[in-house]
């Protein structure tokens, strides 16, 4: 996201992975149908990236990422921004993450070297393939 912003693309990062420190609950309430879209507040980082984050506590255990509301929201944001980047939850622990991947034009899988096995990668690749998600790359990071 920062690279796109430095290239002067209007960039939005939608962080669905977890609660961000101080995340506003407006986005989660909107996804749950308890608030209108104007309740969604983006924070702007010093590098110019706009960020919208989930507030998981506000979701009361509901799986909201596979919703039509999120799909519509992302489509609207694609019209407003040059680049919309979605940080999805861990594919190993959240079935909704696969639904989010289906909404994206491109998918890059990131995994920590010490927490992933070849079997995990095979299962993730197979599930993404079965869901017609094109994987553009895999980034393995960490010690």
Predicted features along the sequence, with ranges:
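Short glycine-/small-residue-rich Rossmann-like dinucleotide-binding loops
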Residues: 89-90, 112
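Conserved beta-strand/loop subsegment of P-loop NTPase cores
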Residues: 12, 52, 104-143
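P-loop/Walker-type NTP enzyme "switch/lid" segment
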Residues: 2, 6-83, 90-102
């Amino acid at each position: 996201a920062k690279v796109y912003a430095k290239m002067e693309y209007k960039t939005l990062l939608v962080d669905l992975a977890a609660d961000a420190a101080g995340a506003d609950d407006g986005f989660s309430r909107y996804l749950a149908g308890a608030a209108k879209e104007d309740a969604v507040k983006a924070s702007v980082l010093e590098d110019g990236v706009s960020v919208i984050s989930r507030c998981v506590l506000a979701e009361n255990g509901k799986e909201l990422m596979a919703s039509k509301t999120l799909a519509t929201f992302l489509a609207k944001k694609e019209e407003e921004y040059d680049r919309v980047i979605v940080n999805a939850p861990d594919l190993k622990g959240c079935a909704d993450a696969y639904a989010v991947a289906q909404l994206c034009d491109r998918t890059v899988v990131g995994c920590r070297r010490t927490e992933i096995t070849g079997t995990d990668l095979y299962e993730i690749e197979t599930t993404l393939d079965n869901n017609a998600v094109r994987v553009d790359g895999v980034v393995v990071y960490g010690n």
